[in-house]
């Protein structure tokens, strides 16, 4: 059974908030600096942000490389720091999720293990996939963790999707939001129209 987003966190997300992408802290020899990484997490909490997104572009996708093996550590460190702060307000923990289905499922399960509330599901790097295959991947991940969809512009590895794709996407249970970074008004409107036409129009945030 998939995890469901806490109502207080959903209310924060729907009301509108700032969820910055968490950078990766390295020392002068380009090694992971855990102390400064934890300091960055504390900074975002102190700044009044509504949450942080960890394991996304600013955290560098290379942390997933087998030769680097930092994805687990980076997710764990941020989550530990947030939990130890014992904030008296909602704070959304978002984990970046990417790759083919098997990788995306493994990352979703890891995010859940460390107490993340949402998975920001990238659809980049799937140029050879059909829209039907990508939608099934979304369903598989959403069966594990609540999902924020991510429409990424083609110039940085994304792809263009049809209105029909987003119409089906919006009907998938446990999709909580869609981040639209297509940087194209027509593609953006496709997402807006699809969500507004779906049965879940009152449940999905943009």
Q: What are the residue ranges of the model-derived segments?
A:
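Active-site beta->alpha loop and helix N-cap motifs at the rims of alpha/beta catalytic domains
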Residues: 2-160
